[in-house]
């Protein structure tokens, strides 16, 4: 066996602890059918020369313009775009780049973006033309845009966004503003079969009509949209700004309040052949954009729902919704906002705008309860119109307008109870106007496909904070849901006071010698337990809890490992929540944490990674985590990101501590986990010594206490060392089969058996008692043999 093969096997073996697992089948034919061939294309960069240091030399391909200092972009031949955040036209350029490219890294002064096939698909879906994209890049770039980039943009946008599947008056139409594209599609025999025919068997005529588009979301006069938060007058007063940039933003992002007339050509298709039509169009590289003309849908009844007068949208929330409803119809797609930035209000506003039956899917029962609370808080919907469908709460769905459930309930494949089966039949039989998908990137792509086949919705809106997955299924989900409609900049929201200003810190905790000796010797999963239960980590956690409780802060401590979670919480006398905790007990602990001044610290396992709404929390301490998962790190930071009352924007008002045992695998994982947040502009402060820790009275101060803890950890089974598996929630590994390595004693069930010998001298009081001759022969020393 070659070295490469051995390394490959080794990497597969260790995959469970290195990256976040997304359980899914190998991508087969069905998986590929949902993704256009152009989606996998990358920018080709073969002409760059490398210097002696390995850096790429682009001077020949990127000649500088004479006024390059006034322009904010560098467009590299490999598809990477660099934006100067200190440019006077930064706001204009940033809005354009968010529309056409994926953010890679956004620190303080220079932002990096990358052109991808999917980002360009998203750009054309919101109305940008190929010529617009290339023209604006040329205007904003300090250099000439490389020819390879121009060709890549043309290749990816030549067919994307040109054809739409529109639902009008409960009839499906394939619509386009390009008559030649419609004619090209109709030449295909499969699409010709999907076309609706009249009673005589003849094809229905092509429909030519003038479509008047007007945004369904009215533009707020106070929100200061247009060029985001920058002032247009200030830009025009700058003498170093080129004249051709003045009208740039107005051209790129037209004011959608003005009515615009567009001539379209369309033909009607058979409803029962929609799925086949979509697959065929993707095969022809003309993916259908789903748009829902909800205003003209007379078949599905309007529901009685409006926003309350107290619900005021923030500028970025309003902008994201204008991207969704920009042409008077509802576009399917993804809105990316940080945790705590008000994603729920965006979802409720979308439901109030469409005013058709709405299905909301979350990833836990707690998420369902919180979505119900959000609808009652922000909208005028009557409580009787909201129906929950979880394992604990199955409301009667009679005449219900808003249904809220979890992915696991809908994707459940085994036998259901009679009551659950009736609710599922009701969900399947309804025609849903809007489906809100909360953090759908946390579930496997295969499960999401199953959910899509069970319930049909005219418009799908995904709300997420982290558009990342550790597997390669991100493209599948992107094309199944729709394009990215809007993505916010975390640092801008923080500087504006919309989310908390967080101090992130990585606290290095030295391993005690006894624990480290065992850590080096043991090769099983118990290593994870050893660095999690490190006494110095426990002391650091206890010190931070005491320090912040004296400041009247509200603290959440996260631990993926249940053994560690219980040990920490019970020893410190704090309440804890994990998978088996009953729903009623969970809600009671959370309510006490929110309102009881005596309960300032709670311990939570990975069940609290998403959908736990705890706006009062302002300190988060992480003692164990899921390998190198970037998404989990961002989701956990989100628990303390909600804006704090009476906050001062210049000062840190929230704290995120990640406790890491030094010289262990945990340090490598920690670096990987921080990648996403560092790319958003956050910086992690490394703390090697906590000031004042020596003066505190903390647990495990003596060697004897540490030795007792070590014995307890060594007596734990391999199962105790594994992370929690949350039953009934996708995104967790299903417990069907597991393979573990261990000793023969462990496999034979003798994990808890410890052989101990110790000698003790008999006291005078006991010397008079009758002793068996076998023991009396040994004199005063008695040998005690104990098997635990």
Curated annotation (Swiss-Prot):
Annotated catalysed reactions: Couples ATP hydrolysis with the unwinding of duplex DNA by translocating in the 3'-5' direction; ATP + H2O = ADP + phosphate + H(+)
Enzyme kind, highest EC tier: isomerase
Chain residue ranges for the region called Disordered: 1-46
TM region positions: none
Record key words, sorted: ATP-binding, DNA damage, DNA repair, DNA-binding, Helicase, Hydrolase, Isomerase, Nucleotide-binding, Nucleus, Transcription, Transcription regulation
Domain Helicase C-terminal: 539-699
PROSITE patterns named among the record's database cross-references: HELICASE_ATP_BIND_1, HELICASE_CTER
This enzyme's EC code(s): 5.6.2.4
GO molecular function: 3'-5' DNA helicase activity; ATP binding; ATP hydrolysis activity; DNA binding
Motif placement: DEVH box: 438-441
GO cellular component, one term: transcription preinitiation complex
Occurrences of domain Helicase ATP-binding (ranges): 324-485
GO biological process: nucleotide-excision repair; transcription by RNA polymerase II; transcription initiation at RNA polymerase II promoter
Segments carrying motif Nuclear localization signal: 3-15
Location in the cell: Nucleus
Sites where the protein binds ATP: 337-344
Entry-linked NCBIfam families: rad25
Coiled-coil residue windows: none
Name the record gives this protein: General transcription and DNA repair factor IIH helicase/translocase subunit XPB
Basic residues bias locations: 1-14
Gene behind the chain: ERCC3
SUBUNIT field: Component of the 7-subunit TFIIH core complex composed of XPB/ERCC3, XPD/ERCC2, GTF2H1, GTF2H2, GTF2H3, GTF2H4 and GTF2H5, which is active in NER. The core complex associates with the 3-subunit CDK-activating kinase (CAK) module composed of CCNH/cyclin H, CDK7 and MNAT1 to form the 10-subunit holoenzyme (holo-TFIIH) active in transcription. Interacts with PUF60. Interacts with ATF7IP. Interacts with Epstein-Barr virus EBNA2.
Biological role stated in the UniProt entry: ATP-dependent 3'-5' DNA helicase/translocase; binds dsDNA rather than ssDNA, unzipping it in a translocase rather than classical helicase activity. Component of the general transcription and DNA repair factor IIH (TFIIH) core complex. When complexed to CDK-activating kinase (CAK), involved in RNA transcription by RNA polymerase II. The ATPase activity of XPB/ERCC3, but not its helicase activity, is required for DNA opening; it may wrap around the damaged DNA wedging it open, causing localized melting and twisting that allows XPD/ERCC2 helicase to anchor.
């Amino acid at each position: 066996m070659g070295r490469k093969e051995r390394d490959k096997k080794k990497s597969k073996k260790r995959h469970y602890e290195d990256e976040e697992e997304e359980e899914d089948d190998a991508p087969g034919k069905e998986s590929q059918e949902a993704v256009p061939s152009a989606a996998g294309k990358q920018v080709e960069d073969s002409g760059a020369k490398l210097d002696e240091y390995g850096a790429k030399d682009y001077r020949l391909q990127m000649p500088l313009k004479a006024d390059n200092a006034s322009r904010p972009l560098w467009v590299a031949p490999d598809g990477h775009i660099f934006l100067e955040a200190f440019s006077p036209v930064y706001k204009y350029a940033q809005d354009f780049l968010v529309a056409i490219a994926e953010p890679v890294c956004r620190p303080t002064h220079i932002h990096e973006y990358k052109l991808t096939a999917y980002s360009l698909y998203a750009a054309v879906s919101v109305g940008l033309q190929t010529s617009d994209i290339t023209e604006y890049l040329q205007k904003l770039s300090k250099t000439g845009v490389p020819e390879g980039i121009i060709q890549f943009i043309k290749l990816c946008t030549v067919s994307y966004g040109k054809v739409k599947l529109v639902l009008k008056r409960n009839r499906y139409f394939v619509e386009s503003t390009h008559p030649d594209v419609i004619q090209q599609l109709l030449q295909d025999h499969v699409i010709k079969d999907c076309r609706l025919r009249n009673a005589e068997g003849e094809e229905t005529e092509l429909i030519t009509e003038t479509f008047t588009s007007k945004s369904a979301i009215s533009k707020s006069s106070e929100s200061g949209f247009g060029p985001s938060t920058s002032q247009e007058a200030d830009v025009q007063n700058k003498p170093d700004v080129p004249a051709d940039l003045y009208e740039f933003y107005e051209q790129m992002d037209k004011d959608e309040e003005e009515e615009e007339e567009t001539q379209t050509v369309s033909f009607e298709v058979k409803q029962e052949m929609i799925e086949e039509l979509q697959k065929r169009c993707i095969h022809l590289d003309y993916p259908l954009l789903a748009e829902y003309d909800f205003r003209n849908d007379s078949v599905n009844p309007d529901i009685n729902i409006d926003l309350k007068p107290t619900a005021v949208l923030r500028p970025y929330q309003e902008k994201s919704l204008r991207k969704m409803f920009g042409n008077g119809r509802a576009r399917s797609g993804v809105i990316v906002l940080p945790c705590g930035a008000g994603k729920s209000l965006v979802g409720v506003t979308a439901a109030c705008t469409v005013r058709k039956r709405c299905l909301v899917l979350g990833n836990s029962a707690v998420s369902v309860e919180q979505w119900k609370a959000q609808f009652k808080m922000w909208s005028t919907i009557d409580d009787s119109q909201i129906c929950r469908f979880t394992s604990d709460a199955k409301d009667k769905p009679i005449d219900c307008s808003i249904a809220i459930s979890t992915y696991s309930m809908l994707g459940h494949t085994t036998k259901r109870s009679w009551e659950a089966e009736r609710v599922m039949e009701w969900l399947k039989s309804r025609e849903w106007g809007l489906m809100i998908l909360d953090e759908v990137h946390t579930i496997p792509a295969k499960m999401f496909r199953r959910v899509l086949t069970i319930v049909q919705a005219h418009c799908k809106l995904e709300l997420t904070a982290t558009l990342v997955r550790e597997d390669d299924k991100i493209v599948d989900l992107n094309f199944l849901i729709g394009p990215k409609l809007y993505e916010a900049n975390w640092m801008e929201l923080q500087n504006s006071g919309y989310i908390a200003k967080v101090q992130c810190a990585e606290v290095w905790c030295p391993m005690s010698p006894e624990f480290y000796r065992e850590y080096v010797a043991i090769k099983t999963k118990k290593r994870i337990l050893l660095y999690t239960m490190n006494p110095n980590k426990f002391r650091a956690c206890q010190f931070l809890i005491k320090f912040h409780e004296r400041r009247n802060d509200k603290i959440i401590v996260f631990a993926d490992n249940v053994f560690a979670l219980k040990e920490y919480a019970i020893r410190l006398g704090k309440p804890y929540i994990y998978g088996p905790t009953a729903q009623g007990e969970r809600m009671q602990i959370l309510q006490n944490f929110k309102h009881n001044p005596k309960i300032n610290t709670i311990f939570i396992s990975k069940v609290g990674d998403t959908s736990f709404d705890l706006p009062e929390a302002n300190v988060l301490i992480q003692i164990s985590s899921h390998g190198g998962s970037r998404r989990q790190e961002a989701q956990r930071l989100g628990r303390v990101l909600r804006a704090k009352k009476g906050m001062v924007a210049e000062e840190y008002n929230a704290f995120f501590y990640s406790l890491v045992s030094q010289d262990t695998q945990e340090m490598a994982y920690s670096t990987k986990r921080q990648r996403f947040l560092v790319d958003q502009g956050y910086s992690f402060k490394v703390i090697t010594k906590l000031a004042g820790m020596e003066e505190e009275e903390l647990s495990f101060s003596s060697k004897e206490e540490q030795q007792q803890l070590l014995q307890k950890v060594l007596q734990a089974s391999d199962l105790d060392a594994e992370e929690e598996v949350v039953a009934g929630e996708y995104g967790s590994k299903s417990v069907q089969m597991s393979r573990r390595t261990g000793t023969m004693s462990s496999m034979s069930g003798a994990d808890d058996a410890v052989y101990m010998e110790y000698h003790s001298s008999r006291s005078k009081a006991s010397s008079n008692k009758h002793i068996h001759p076998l023991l009396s022969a040994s004199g005063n020393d008695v040998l005690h043999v104990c098997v635990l």
